[in-house]
């Protein structure tokens, strides 16, 4: 060894070069005023003495790290790491190692003190070649680097130029925190070491693949870096707090890291051959001491099984094995929840010997207890919260789960079976614990609520009620029961909307419109629409609808006007009308007749019609001219079904077409008429008017000896002039003037003013010829009463007005016209407010003199071939359920001019029969909806 000379030489001697293992003469110089501190080596000492040029000069100021290297097969190696690469010296003994290493570090510190540089104290430095794989090429970290490990980070320092041959930039130096490394491993045959970085690393998430000089270096890198990641040194434990400017709390353990890798990210050679023999490794670094850092495995987590924990082994404190138990105050049963290695797996790595993944291993030589005895409990994974936050395990048993052990009662009173586990009995019905008393809900009510028959209808599951809920529900149903008391045997019912139970659904109005007899002087709008009987038109057992939604206040629902916006149908059956005495006739009729009655529409007050009855026969009988049905209706209440023609469906055995009857009215009263003039402005050809003389008119009228029992069909141009003399004596007459009314079946009628009503229908051209032949047979029938035939048509009619000039001209010709198609009778009953009054002849009345009757009959006009201008048919968008107001004699108390309705395509035919006394009806649709505009009643 050469002595220290005046030029600053400190040490010299023969040592081996690590790369070639050849002996070289090394000379160490300190810093002088002339030269810097440096390390030189020569081939031989002779060349050094001859002042030959050294083989290599390494300046200590360029070395960022000088330390001992333990990853080689040589025991005493010192490595000087610089940007030009690493240089290793193999010494002969430990003493030589200590002497040279201490002198090198002393010179380095002196340089750092002089220049103000700070050198990092790297524990391990490996020279690696980062392959162009994974994320390396993207981030620009490829080529030869120094991999420097410290207690908190892993630093890569570039070796060589900062640009590649292709001109790409290289990262000169970068530091990666150990906490951002997800996992690491090595592959021995290929001398490959790799590691996966997380998203929080400075390079982002990805993998780095590095090639080492030999497989031993790759293995050493894996073990050393994994030990550093798992170490529990003070600097590493509180690394996150220090970096985030938080206080250094050394007694708090670091949080376990979560697994973020999957099997697909592992290399193929690493995944293979996972089952190998157990291998225990010793610590390879003197700096690996202390407790290992708690960290979760890098691979995807899964819940371990009991078989895995049963295969765990005991390991002494002298083995550097990674502990996966939770430290602190948590019990040791809260062990690692995933990926515990089995007995036959290598403990140095969860992977094979050739591919060792950092799962459950550590190079720490620290002492820790036997944690592997029961690393997997049967209670599943334990959360990382403190024990104070854990749920109470009062009902958890150590044995296997059972139905009673794992059940936590939810009853207000804890059953005795949970207080005494040995006595497990089912509660008895008389158990006092089951007697739950609640205010306003007695136990009897609760017992009645649990009725299986009421809830188990149609095989449905039993509904669960809250305490006392069903009791109030049943009370509400009882209070509302009379609103919907039909269909008591329904199994499943549909629900009403909120507040709709008190009203009849509109669909019921479209199917059938019925009102019960007013026998008890109650409001008809409150009666049920479904009544048992052959005329009901609907099913007799209608299902009661449930009220699933909360109903509105009962006070608002049950009122007298809850159906005021709907139609009104009033059919009552009354007793026979008592005849008027002469005093009553004079007081009610004669004294109130206006003087000028020609320009005023006749009005009448409505008599009591509470006992009126309607009877109907089929429409076929009307067309065929059959006899009228004079028997009383078999229905209980005398209902008349109002229904659209043709399209609506009826489930009643008595269908609508069978109920389209002809109307027969029998008037038992005889009307003393002094003079009756019928003014009409029908478009009758002039030649027919000339043929009809007053003599012929009187002859034809005398042949009609039946009782006047027809409805007077007054058009707008037909003004009724009745001059009644109060002083005319009252006469008795047994004669009955029968006027047989035929049907006006012409589509071209011409109507005049709007003073009276006429029920107008038109007939299509296809049916006209058939009906015309049937009417001839109908005229031959000398039956009492009159008929109103309604025929559905394809178009509607509209009235047209005629000027005053035509009206005056028609008044002069009114006595010359008699038709065979229309027979008119008085339309209004005697009234105190009428401007024109008509009277029927009856058996029980005193009749006026014969000349009065003759004068009356002379003025009754029967028109033929009425031609009205047809109006366009109704729009197709109008509904087929029509509303109308039909005022018959002795029934109306309204001015018909107020109820002018427009015709539509179809209208429900109406028919009545005459029985005892005057039988009339009132069909009132005054307050119907917009569809009421399609009525068939015209104000003529």
Curated annotation (Swiss-Prot):
A motif (YXXM motif 1) lies at residues 407-410. Signal peptide: none annotated. This is Insulin receptor substrate 1. Residues 122-236 form the IRS-type PTB domain. GO terms for biological process: cellular response to starvation; determination of adult lifespan; germ-line stem-cell niche homeostasis; glucose homeostasis; growth of a germarium-derived egg chamber; insulin receptor signaling pathway; insulin-like growth factor receptor signaling pathway; lipid homeostasis. Bindings to phosphatidylinositol 3-kinase and SHP2. The modification Phosphoserine is found at residues 284-285, 340, 548, 904, 907. GO terms for cellular component: cell cortex; cytoplasm; cytosol; intracellular membrane-bounded organelle; nucleus; plasma membrane. Keywords: Differentiation, Growth regulation, Oogenesis, Phosphoprotein, Repeat. A motif (YXXM motif 2) lies at residues 639-642. Activates phosphatidylinositol 3-kinase when bound to the regulatory p85 subunit. May mediate the control of various cellular processes by insulin-like peptides. When phosphorylated by the insulin receptor binds specifically to various cellular proteins containing SH2 domains. Involved in control of cell proliferation, cell size, and body and organ growth throughout development. Also has a role in a signaling pathway controlling the physiological response required to endure periods of low nutrient conditions. Residues 523-549, 895-915 are annotated as: Disordered. CDD domains: PH_IRS, PTB_IRS. GO terms for molecular function: insulin receptor binding; insulin-like growth factor receptor binding; phosphatidylinositol 3-kinase binding. The keyword Disulfide bond does not apply. The modification Phosphotyrosine is found at residues 407, 883, 920. Disulfide bonds: none annotated. Residues 523-540 have a biased composition (Polar residues). It comes from Drosophila ananassae.
């Amino acid at each position: 060894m050469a002595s220290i000379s005046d030029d600053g030489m400190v040490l010299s001697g023969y040592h081996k070069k690590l790369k070639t293992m050849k002996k070289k003469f090394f000379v160490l110089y300190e810093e002088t005023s002339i030269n810097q501190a440096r390390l030189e080596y020569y081939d031989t000492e002779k060349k050094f003495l001859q002042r030959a040029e050294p083989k290599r000069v390494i300046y200590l100021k360029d070395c960022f790290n000088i330390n001992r290297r333990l990853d080689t097969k040589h025991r005493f190696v010192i490595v000087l790491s610089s940007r030009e690469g690493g240089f290793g010296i193999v010494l002969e003994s430990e003493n030589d190692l200590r002497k040279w290493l201490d002198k090198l570090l002393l010179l380095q510190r002196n340089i750092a003190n002089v220049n103000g540089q700070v050198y990092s104290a790297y524990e391990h430095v490996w020279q690696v070649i980062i392959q162009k794989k994974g994320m390396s090429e993207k981030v620009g970290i490829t080529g030869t680097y120094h991999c420097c490990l410290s207690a908190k980070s892993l630093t890569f320092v570039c070796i060589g130029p900062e640009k590649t041959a292709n001109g790409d930039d290289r990262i000169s130096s970068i530091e990666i925190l150990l906490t951002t490394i997800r996992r690491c491993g090595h592959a021995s045959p290929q001398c490959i070491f790799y590691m996966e970085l997380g998203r929080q690393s400075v390079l982002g998430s990805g993998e780095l693949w590095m090639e080492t000089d030999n497989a031993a270096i790759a293995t050493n890198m894996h073990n050393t870096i994994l030990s550093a990641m798992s170490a529990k040194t003070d600097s590493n434990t509180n690394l996150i707090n220090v970096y985030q400017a938080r206080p250094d709390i050394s007694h708090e353990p670091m949080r376990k890291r979560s697994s973020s890798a999957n099997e697909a990210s592992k290399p193929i050679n690493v995944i293979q051959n996972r089952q190998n023999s157990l291998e225990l490794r010793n610590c390879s670094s003197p700096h690996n001491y202390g407790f290992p850092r708690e960290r979760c495995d890098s691979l995807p987590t899964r819940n371990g099984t009991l078989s895995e924990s049963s295969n765990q082994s005991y390991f002494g404190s002298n083995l550097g094995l990674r502990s996966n138990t939770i430290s602190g105050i948590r019990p040791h049963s809260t062990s690692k929840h995933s990926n515990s290695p089995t007995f036959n797996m290598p403990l140095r790595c969860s992977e094979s010997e050739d591919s060792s993944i950092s799962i459950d291993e550590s190079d720490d030589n620290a002492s820790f207890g036997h944690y592997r005895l029961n690393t997997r409990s049967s209670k599943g994974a334990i959360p990382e919260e403190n024990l104070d936050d854990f749920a109470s395990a009062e009902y958890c048993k150590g044995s296997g789960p059972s139905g009673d052990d794992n059940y936590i009662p939810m009853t207000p009173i804890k059953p005795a079976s949970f207080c005494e586990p040995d006595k497990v009995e089912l509660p008895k019905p008389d158990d006092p614990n089951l007697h739950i008393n609640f205010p306003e809900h007695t136990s009897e009510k609760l017992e009645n609520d649990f009725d299986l028959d009421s809830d188990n209808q149609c095989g449905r599951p039993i509904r669960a009620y809250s305490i006392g809920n069903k009791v109030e529900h049943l009370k509400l149903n009882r209070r509302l029961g009379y609103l919907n008391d039909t269909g008591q045997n329904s199994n499943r019912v549909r629900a009403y909307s909120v507040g709709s139970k008190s009203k009849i659904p509109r669909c019921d109005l479209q199917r059938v419109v019925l009102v019960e007899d007013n026998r008890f002087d109650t409001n008809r709008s409150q009666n049920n629409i479904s009544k048992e009987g052959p005329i009901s038109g609907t099913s007799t057992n209608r299902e009661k609808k449930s009220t699933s939604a909360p109903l509105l206040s009962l006070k608002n629902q049950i009122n007298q006007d809850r159906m005021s916006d709907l139609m009104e149908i009033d059919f009552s059956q009354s007793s026979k009308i008592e005849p008027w005495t002469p005093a009553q006739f004079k007081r009610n009729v004669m004294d109130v007749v206006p003087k000028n009655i020609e320009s005023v529409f006749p009005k009448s007050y409505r008599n009591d019609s509470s006992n009126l009855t309607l009877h109907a026969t089929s429409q076929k009988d009307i067309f065929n001219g059959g006899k009228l049905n004079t028997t009383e209706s078999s229905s209980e209440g005398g209902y008349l079904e109002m229904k659209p023609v043709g399209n609506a469906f009826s489930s009643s055995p008595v269908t609508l077409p069978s109920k389209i009857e002809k109307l027969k009215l029998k008037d038992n009263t005889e009307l003393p008429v002094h003079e009756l003039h019928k003014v009409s402005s029908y478009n009758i050809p002039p030649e027919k008017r000339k043929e009809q003389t007053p003599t012929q008119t009187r002859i034809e009228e005398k042949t009609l000896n039946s009782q006047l029992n027809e409805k007077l069909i007054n058009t707008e141009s037909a003004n009724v002039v009745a001059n009644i003399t109060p002083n005319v004596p009252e006469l008795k007459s047994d004669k009955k003037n029968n006027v047989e009314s035929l049907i006006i079946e012409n589509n071209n009628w011409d109507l005049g003013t709007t003073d009276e009503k006429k029920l107008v229908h038109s007939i299509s051209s296809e049916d006209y010829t058939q009906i015309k032949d049937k009417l001839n047979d109908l005229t031959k029938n000398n039956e009492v009463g009159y008929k109103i035939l309604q025929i559905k048509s394809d178009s509607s009619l509209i009235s047209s007005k005629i000027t005053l000039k035509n009206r005056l001209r028609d008044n002069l010709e009114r006595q010359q016209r008699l038709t065979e198609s229309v027979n008119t009778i008085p339309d209004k009953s005697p009234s105190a407010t009428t401007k024109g009054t008509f009277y029927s002849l009856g058996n029980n009345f005193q009749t006026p003199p014969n000349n009065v009757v003759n004068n009356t009959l002379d003025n009754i006009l029967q028109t033929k071939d009425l031609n009205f201008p047809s109006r366009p048919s109704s729009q197709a968008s109008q509904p087929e359920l029509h509303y109308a107001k039909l005022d018959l004699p002795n029934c109306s108390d309204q001015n018909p001019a107020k109820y002018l309705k427009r015709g539509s395509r179809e209208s429900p035919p109406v028919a009545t029969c005459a029985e005892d006394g005057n039988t009339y009806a009132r069909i009132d649709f005054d307050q119907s909806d917009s569809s009421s505009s399609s009525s068939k009643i015209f104000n003529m």
